[in-house]
């Protein structure tokens, strides 16, 4: 029996939730912090144009949420299949799912990148870029979009790694990527004088580092699953199941992107570019309070999937009860803070 099988199937639910959620929470908090630091560096690096530059980054946020929709749609859909397959001891199905996740996320990301590059300026105007902010938004978003596949691949496959119960390595991917970004930001923005373009390039490089770490994970003996190229041939059954499970998360993020579009347009009309910049900063600060809750969600997913696949429904129900108590307590604490 693999050590993660014993952990997911036998260890107490309370200990499991803490053990699997804590690394996810740490990684997500650091990631949220680097997003905030990114904005701070841009604000300090562009002098009188800083608010326009921050507004440009804020306008790009709905597009980044769409990128997240792709990553989470594939990641959550595929990881659910993987954890249930591991619970049933069906290693081949788990490996086929990992390979098909790669195929799906890369294909969709390339299509998304091509679409955005063709219609970038019209999209940015729809998302709230004024004529003054548009050059900053374009300069930043162009590079972010070019790096779409790096981001979505790293984020989606981190979910697959988490599905094995290896939340520590998934955390390491987020930590190393975030720290890389924080180190590169001042270098590109201040030392090279590249402004918002430098911030975007630093972000893309950090996402590429995440991709390299995912590749290393599957190439080494760290994963219990092999990434087999022959399995990357699309399996319609696995792809269909991945899409059907991940669709709700995908739609949720698309709707969230649409809401930010409406917010930005309203702020542009009634408050101007500075209001959009302030709103963008506020959202990034607010995200720090949400990350622990999202971390709990990520931590309990492999517990759900594995025990559901193993027909241990009592443990599934217990996980739901424990996680509900923890999340409720976190929400109360966040509200008080």
What residue spans do the PLM features occupy?
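Interhelical loop/hinge segments that connect adjacent transmembrane helices in multipass membrane
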Residues: 1-21, 203, 215-256
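Membrane-interface helix-loop junctions in multi-pass transport and translocation proteins
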Residues: 10, 178-212, 337
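Signature of the first transmembrane helix
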Residues: 15-79, 247-268
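Residue-level recognition of transmembrane alpha-helices
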Residues: 21, 28, 58-61, 105, ...
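Helix-terminus/linker motif at the lipid-water interface of multi-pass membrane proteins
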Residues: 29, 33-54, 124-131, 187-194, ...
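Small-residue-rich hydrophobic transmembrane alpha-helices
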Residues: 54-114, 151-170, 278-336
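Short membrane-interface helical motifs at transmembrane helix boundaries
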Residues: 111-142, 333-337
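Alpha-helical transmembrane segments of multi-pass membrane proteins
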Residues: 131-154, 240, 281-289
